[in-house]
Amino acid sequence: MTISRPEQEVKILVEKDPIKTSFEKWAKPGHFSRNLSKGPNTTTWIWNLHADAHDFDSHTSDLEDISRKVFSAHFGQLAVIFIWISGMYFHGARFSNYEAWLSDPIHIKPSAQVVWPIVGQEILNGDVGGGFQGIQITSGFFQIWRASGITSELQLYTTAIGGLVMAGLMLFAGWFHYHKAAPKLAWFQDVESMLNHHLAGLLGLGSLAWAGHQIHVSMPINELLDAGVDPKEIPLPHEFILNRDLIAELYPSFKSGLIPFFTLNWSAYSDFLTFRGGLNPVTGGLWLSDTAHHHLAIAVLFLIAGHMYRTNWGIGHNMKDILEAHKGPFTGEGHKGLYEIFTTSWHAQLSLNLAMLGSLTIIVAHHMYSMPPYPYLAIDYGTQLSLFTHHMWIGGFCIVGAAAHAAIFMVRDYDSANQYNNLLDRVIRHRDAIISHLNWACIFLGFHSFGLYIHNDTMRALGRPQDMFSDTAIQLQPIFAQWIQNTHVLAPSLTAPQATSATSPVWGEGLITVGGKVAMMPIPLGTADFLVHHIHAFTIHVTVLILLKGVLFSRSSRLIPDKANLGFRFPCDGPGRGGTCQVSAWDHIFLGLFWMYNSLSIAIFHFSWKMQSDVWGNVTPQGISHITGGNFAQSSITINGWLRDFLWAQASQVIQSYGSPLSAYGLIFLGAHFVWAFSLMFLFSGRGYWQELIESIVWAHNKLKVAPAIQPRALSIVQGRAVGVAHYLLGGIATTWAFFLARIISVA
């Protein structure tokens, strides 16, 4: 008797034509809410409309419909991204000096915007070299185009059109997968299939495609550009792809084709897949042959990873099994219950993803300058500073967003009945110990780190430099950081004998200069860095304290035991309970944003000053002339030094920018200060003040018989705070942007 295997049933995971396509709802603002669809009685309606329009949880409790809306919205987001990137490429094609920059990237600055002569605005068109007048850009697009092998504006045009085609495709997909073929809930919850497809498809095949592009297109074109060949003389990408003899002139192993691959003689390919380490001395960027090798290796890893999870074939990992097996001697039930959380709460899933992506973005910020991935990026100081600042802020917002969605998960989706004695439950049960210890750490770090600066300010004021903490008096050397630097210098000889140098000159060996400018060199760390790193530790710990307290106390606290019933955002625990304001999970996000801004301001200020003082500069016969002449070590060890020698001294360019091509930064600097100050109006005054004022103004309108039909109302407490923090951050970020760019474009 033969026992045959039961037939695998094909699951139908798509519902056909679930929702009719109709524009009728577009004409009904607030159609998703019974209250809002009635239309406005008071001005609060428009604020609630904005607050709830994308809060799909508030529209329906049907998880399948919520999932479909989120999925569809993702395609809309991708369409916006494709339109944006298409616009960037179009600007490069239509309004830029890309071809001129490509022929002389050392002396010509990138520009992709020319201002029309209206009311004298053409003053903004500065001379960027090569006879081109325009606004200098610091986005890094020219460098990434060079690394991709783009040699003409026609190629930028065609890529821009491709971006618009992709945007159209994404918009179609968003409509199709909501109205025509909408996935069922089971499809969204099939995590093993999702992992396989995302790992093997997006990351594996994505990296493989990029490695293929780098090898067949980018590297030969960049090899010729580095050798000084005129971009117009370089063969087109398809010629390198189709004509093996052409690329074999540059990389002889191409003559052998795939024979070395199948005979396992992989070292034959080492002419274009290298493991050099360090930076290319011609361009100041990573060796493109190293990055091609890296992407090929990443592709192999992720293609393997994309076959690890169990789907229809009964082999491989099962996420539920992995999570439930994950327990130690002190962790109770471990991760039991976590699978159910991540397959039924998209807020929990989003929180995890934002935390990981935010951390990764900050890691990217630190690698962009220390291991510049694109040619000539390292000597474009404005772009280096912009990319660091941009990635730091994006990472910070993602991490605060992670806390926000963790708290929303706790309030809306957490079911304590299913979470008994697992790690999450145990963390929540000893939250008092966690928060009080973290609070102690914040107090310790705050007093000690700030105290070191106050000591130095006092000693300098009293004329006692010998009693200061500095490299020339009482030294506080960052010995662990110096040990890590030294370890990385030694690493190639120990762990990677084939590599010719360490991952970056930052660690302590070699000076890379391009066109007489420092691309990268060893970054010495001393007492000044020790001091400011402890300020970083302090501000980061306070940010974490606020965000973590918000998450752990989002459902209940001693003060408000039934907090979960009040929701994610609420002003106070009702009338008659004084002292219960600003306790909602939303308020912790609100406060966390300010400390995130504090943390990152100090981090980007540290980076900006340190690089200008100790790294960036010109090579002269007498040695290296740094932009601020190495003043960081002695000036940044006092609060007064930060105020006088960094903020004030380096603000002179933006303050004096009027009448120059940088004058827009002067106006932005001024305007952003106003936006920031405007935020304080919302943050410092209570709702009652404004309601009284409004009622007085309404009285005057009634007198004149011009009273509005929609009753004016003061912003709610939560709305006022939201407007306040938005303007605080917008004003602060734009002020910093203008300050940094006017400075670095002037001196670089």
UniProtKB/Swiss-Prot annotation:
Gene Ontology molecular function: 4 iron, 4 sulfur cluster binding; chlorophyll binding; electron transfer activity; magnesium ion binding; oxidoreductase activity
InterPro entries (UniProt xref): PSI_PsaA, PSI_PsaA/B, PSI_PsaA/B_CS, PSI_PsaA/B_sf
Binding locations of [4Fe-4S] cluster: 572, 581
Cofactor binding: number and manner: P700 is a chlorophyll a/chlorophyll a' dimer, A0 is one or more chlorophyll a, A1 is one or both phylloquinones and FX is a shared 4Fe-4S iron-sulfur center.
Alphabetized Pfam families for the sequence: PsaA_PsaB (PF00223)
Domain of life where this protein originates: Eukaryota
Keyword line: 4Fe-4S, Chlorophyll, Chloroplast, Chromophore, Electron transport, Iron, Iron-sulfur, Magnesium, Membrane, Metal-binding, Oxidoreductase, Photosynthesis, Photosystem I, Plastid, Thylakoid, Transmembrane, Transmembrane helix, Transport
Major enzyme class: oxidoreductase
One annotated GO biological process: photosynthesis
Disulfide bonds: none
Residues at which chlorophyll a binds: 681, 689
Transmembrane residue ranges: 70-93, 156-179, 195-219, 291-309, 346-369, 385-411, 433-455, 530-548, 588-609, 662-684, 722-742
A GO term from the CC aspect: photosystem I
Protein's job: PsaA and PsaB bind P700, the primary electron donor of photosystem I (PSI), as well as the electron acceptors A0, A1 and FX. PSI is a plastocyanin-ferredoxin oxidoreductase, converting photonic excitation into a charge separation, which transfers an electron from the donor P700 chlorophyll pair to the spectroscopically characterized acceptors A0, A1, FX, FA and FB in turn. Oxidized P700 is reduced on the lumenal side of the thylakoid membrane by plastocyanin.
Assembly with partners or alone: The PsaA/B heterodimer binds the P700 chlorophyll special pair and subsequent electron acceptors. PSI consists of a core antenna complex that captures photons, and an electron transfer chain that converts photonic excitation into a charge separation. The eukaryotic PSI reaction center is composed of at least 11 subunits.
Family statement: Belongs to the PsaA/PsaB family.
Record-given protein name: Photosystem I P700 chlorophyll a apoprotein A1
Protein's organism: Chara vulgaris (Common stonewort)
Gene that this polypeptide is encoded by: psaA
